[in-house]
Amino acid sequence: MKKLITIVGPTAVGKTDLTLALAKGYNGEVISGDAYQVYKQLNIGTAKPTTDELAAVPHHLINILEPDDDYSVSIFQQQAKSLINQLNDNHVVPILSGGTGLYVQSLLENYNFNDIKPNTKLRIELDELYTEYGVDGLREYAQNLAEKGGIEIKYTDKHRLYRAIELMTAGDYKSLIKQTKEGLSYKGPVIGLQRERSDLYDRINRRVEIMFEKGLVDEVKQLLKSGVNPNCQAFKGIGYKEVVQYLEGLISYDACVDLIQKNTRHFAKRQITWYKRMPYIEWITIDSQTTEAEIYGMVCNIIDSSF
């Protein structure tokens, strides 16, 4: 079984500094599990590691796509699997840093993705269903299809329900049955960092302020000037869509800052909810008084007892 150290947690919790230290301490390289750090030129708004940090330790799945390119969980899973195999073969420890909950879970639990492409027409209909009835409406729709195929659907996440409905509509019940997972795909701990909500939210608010100080507005201006479509997938990330609204005169500067802070806090809350559904995560609680050395020591104790 291939080795993998996984570090998860909500945005701004402190994963970057930890993964850098672990990579140096364990002869490791970092694999990003973030859906937006894959894009070139999207640096400030994605909280991408700095140039110095990227130079200090090899990083993967960062700066690999142009802003107008599409990316998906299945592509991530395929690329991450290949990297983990290569690094293990070279006696290097891969360290997954996440990030995007679906991406991380799909890799660890080896979700089965087949060749059935997303159904645009169906997704528009599902968007309308979701807008009117929420996740409960999607679950009822999915369960009705599942009963016809003699299977059971327990998903509560919007995106997984969308995909399950697509597969069942196409008659592919077999793939969903295969997604029942026994154990994880890799040897190694899955460690989660968590903070008190007030502490995390303070860090998020300050991080957003720093993004503006570093030039987030200019970054978005330059991307638009270079011809990037404001409706592209990359601009769906928090920080970019709001600045576009500001540049279009739809909201004020202060409202833009407030909106990004609010949306990031909501995103962090969703991340926490997602990860709490993954029972194999070993959680470490930290606060503003916990030093980086203390965090590193606690994590190393878990890692050393896992290998």
Over which residues does each language-model region extend?
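Phosphate/pyrophosphate-binding catalytic cores of soluble transferases and nucleic-acid-acting enzymes
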Residues: 1-307
